[in-house]
Amino acid sequence: GEAVDVGRWRGDLATTDLLTLALQPSVMWLGPEPTFAIANDQARQHMRVSNVANGFTTSLNGSGVIVAVADSGLDADHGDFGARVLSNTDVVGDGSTADRHSGHGTHVACTVLGDGSRGGYAGVAPQAELIFQAMENDNNGQFLSPSLNYILNQAYSQGARIHTNSWGSSQVSDQG
């Protein structure tokens, strides 16, 4: 196994060893790691962007706000971010924050705070600053899950008071 973060381990276990491990006093929870999935092709429809854009006008633009996004990875050179990427951190241990396999992390970050300079569509907070937490293993494209406590605390300590997580699983999981 490998240490994921404080108090969490990930690894394979033989079925015959499951009861032995479950009976250890320090073990609070055992379960399968959920398989996460992402979908880039449904955002405008699910977010009802057209309804919001046509419904009201506001002067809010995200100025002075730090937003954290935990997702696959980030194309940090994408023109919509400028110098507003405060940090781009690998939270799964593969040493990379790139968005090699899906583009989902960049898509989500642009939806939140893209300024529209790269394609004409601005995000909902185009002047906000970004803390990005990369959750995709670039070696195999697997989307991994650090503990929510870890990623939320890391982002909070860097000034983020908004954290968005646009991923999930069809499997039931209590991440402990």
State each model region's role:
Residues G1-F56:
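Autoinhibitory propeptides
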Residues G11, L144-S145:
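A conditional alpha-helix N-cap/helix-loop micro-motif detector
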Residues A14, S117, S147-L148:
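Amphipathic coiled-coil/heptad-repeat helices and related helical stalk/stem segments
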Residues L18, G105, S145-N149:
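Amphipathic alpha-helical segments in well-structured domains
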Residues L18-L19, G120, L152:
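Short glycine-/small-residue-rich flexible loop motifs, especially phosphate/cofactor-binding loops
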Residues L23-Q24, A53-T89, D94-L144, S157-I162, ...:
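Subtilisin-like serine protease catalytic core
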Residues N149-Q158:
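Short, well-structured alpha-helical segments in soluble
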